[in-house]
Amino acid sequence: MPRSLKKGPFVDDHLLKKVDVQNEKNTKQVIKTWSRRSTIIPDFIGHTFAVHDGRKHVPVFVTEAMVGHKLGEFAPTRTFKGHIKDDRKAKRR
């Protein structure tokens, strides 16, 4: 079930403060965060976030199309290396 409209989108306070400070100073430094649960709001457009995926920080540049999604959606936590091809030698026995 989606979040109630009267509550508004969830954004961690420390993340919002860092974006506001950068907007005041007109700087665009990478903001390192572990907050994958934060919703992307219009204030984030044009900023780059380094979102933690469990072992490293993945750079995510926020665009208009990302507004309303969560930061964690753009930093995958699992790596898919493909299915193993059948071993033909084992089948001949």
Swiss-Prot record:
InterPro entries: Ribosomal_uS19, Ribosomal_uS19_bac-type, Ribosomal_uS19_CS, Ribosomal_uS19_SF. Keywords: Ribonucleoprotein, Ribosomal protein, RNA-binding, rRNA-binding. It holds the Pfam family Ribosomal_S19. Gene3D superfamilies: 30s Ribosomal Protein S19, Chain A (3.30.860.10). GO terms for molecular function: rRNA binding; structural constituent of ribosome. GO terms for biological process: ribosomal small subunit assembly; translation. Signal peptide: none annotated. The keyword Cytoplasm does not apply. GO terms for cellular component: cytoplasm; small ribosomal subunit. NCBIfam families: rpsS_bact. Belongs to the universal ribosomal protein uS19 family. Protein S19 forms a complex with S13 that binds strongly to the 16S ribosomal RNA. This is Small ribosomal subunit protein uS19. It comes from Mycobacterium leprae (strain TN).
